[in-house]
Regions:
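Transmembrane helix-loop-helix hairpins at membrane boundaries of multipass inner-membrane proteins
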Residues: 1-6, 12-98, 106-107, 453-463
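Interfacial segments of multi-pass membrane proteins
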Residues: 142, 295-302, 376-392
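Alpha-helical multi-pass transmembrane bundles of energy-transducing inner-membrane proteins
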Residues: 20-26, 107-194, 200-205, 274-340
């Protein structure tokens, strides 16, 4: 049996176990968190060459698997993003179990990770977005949840992969017909343009990724944060493979030029709407969009030289996201999902740690000092100032608008108590947020703590 098949079967089994334990969501979340953590630990320790032993079975690592004319292989290059996905899944499952979030999240996390692993390990490369559409369908179920709510987020999550896939399909057809394309240079040029358009769609021009903002208003806090994070890891990996496989893309449109502008437009869009937000969920959605753009801005400005920093970012971001989502989830339990600002009276008095978690997590995501992401955000802005002055100025404006948006929400959360029957935050929520705050503080004081892990992931990732 190949290691890839074992990994997929283990994820499916975890999903089934979580489904059977749906009446005990805390136990289902704990099982998923431990299972994903065990898989991540086993994959981290596994050597690159030769067979490995897991659960008494001999697993072949680089053995390709065939399905529907696709080839799937767990190469060293995709080991790094798979480890990141497993880490994100384990952390979010554990935090969501402690905070009593929606039950559908726990069986859906392993299935979504399995679909994303198929997407990352599939060949031919230009057909891989077909599996991304499958992952998007699963993401839609997670976004909708098991409560009656608007279907905006669930429907919008399907938009980008469905629109991007035909462009990759056209490019794949032209590249497979090289003899025909050689006689028609326009066809060849159109194929490269189609490939670039597909990349543009997946790197999220704002109108096509309204699902990110809709997640804040129409999904649970943990579901929104998890979906945005794992999507970005998968897209980053796919686009990097594209650039290595088809380096001629840079002759038509250099990503080092257009990617930073797309990212800063997202940040500006998000910052402006964060400043004008009237609901807590709305602020959360635009905060996720700002974070998404900031990660691609870091990659676009630094290119391959910043790959280690990008991996460090993907290691630290889930800690800050779970902190913010935990605070928001606890507040939503008392004030309802996506509460309006005018209803948040007394939140800081009755739920001090939940309020602190949301406010601190929000400004830490923006890169505020004392936060775990401060070193990365500072480095990104310094590179922008050195390499692209215009982008730096727009990024500073986006940052200022985002900070003002969080401050507006903080003023509402700290308003005087009006309803004396408002319950206090659960002790488990307070302890969870406290631990996450402490973990973020440790990383902020010692940013190099995770550097060895990021370096090892980069070594594997460079084995393309």
């Amino acid at each position: 049996m190949s290691l890839l098949i074992f990994l997929l079967l283990a994820l499916i089994l975890l999903s089934l176990m979580a489904g059977l334990l749906r009446r005990l969501p805390w136990l289902a979340g704990l099982v998923v968190a431990l299972g994903l953590g065990w898989l991540a630990w086993g994959l981290w320790r596994a050597p690159l060459e030769g067979n490995i032993e897991m659960l008494g079975r001999t697993l072949m690592q680089n053995l390709p698997n065939q399905l529907l004319n696709f080839s799937f292989q767990l190469t060293p290059a995709i080991r790094a993003p798979i480890l990141l996905l497993l880490f994100w899944g384990s952390l979010f499952a554990l935090a969501a179990a402690l905070l009593k979030t929606e039950r559908i999240l726990f069986p859906a996390i392993p299935i979504l990770l399995a679909a994303l692993i198929l997407f990352l390990g599939s060949a031919p490369l230009l057909w891989a977005p077909l599996w991304l559409m499958l992952a998007a369908v699963i993401m839609a179920f997670i976004a909708q949840g098991n409560q009656p709510r608007s279907a905006r987020a669930a429907l919008r999550v399907l938009l980008a992969p469905i629109l991007a896939f035909p462009f990759f399909l056209f490019a794949a057809w032209v590249f497979s017909q090289s003899a025909v394309a050689a006689d028609d240079p326009r066809l060849w040029n159109n194929a490269w343009k189609a490939l670039i358009v597909g990349m543009l769609i997946l790197t999220s021009p704002v109108p096509l990724h309204g699902w990110i903002t809709a997640l804040g208003e129409s999904s649970s806090a943990f579901a929104g944060a998890f979906l945005v994070g794992v999507w970005q890891i998968a897209i980053y990996t796919f686009l990097r493979r594209l650039l290595f496989t088809y380096p001629a893309i840079t002759d038509f449109a250099d990503p080092g030029l257009w990617l930073p502008w797309i990212a800063v437009i997202q940040m500006l869009w998000a910052g402006a709407f964060m400043f004008g937000s009237q609901r807590l969920g709305q602020l959360w959605g635009y905060l996720l969009l700002w974070m998404y753009g900031a990660a691609f801005l870091a990659w676009g400005l630094t290119g391959e030289l910043g790959s280690e920093a990008v991996f460090w970012l993907f290691l630290v971001t889930p800690l800050v996201l779970t902190l913010t989502a935990a605070g928001l989830q606890s507040i939503a339990h008392r004030f309802g999902e996506n509460p309006a600002y005018e209803k948040l009276h007394g939140a800081s008095e009755r739920m001090p740690l939940s309020t602190l978690g949301f406010i601190a997590g929000g400004i830490f995501l923006l890169g505020w000092p004392l936060g775990a992401l401060f070193p990365m955000r500072l480095a990104t802005f310094q590179v922008a100032e050195y390499r692209a002055g215009n982008i730096f100025l727009w990024a500073m404006l986006a940052l200022a608008l985002g900070v003002l948006g969080v401050i507006r929400a903080a003023r509402r959360l700290t308003s005087p108590l009006q309803d004396v029957t408002l319950e206090r935050e659960p002790a488990i929520a307070a302890w969870t947020i406290g631990v996450l705050l402490a973990a973020g503080g440790v990383i902020a004081l010692n940013p190099g703590l995770l550097s060895p892990i990021a370096q090892q992931l980069l070594i594997w990732f460079n084995m393309l």
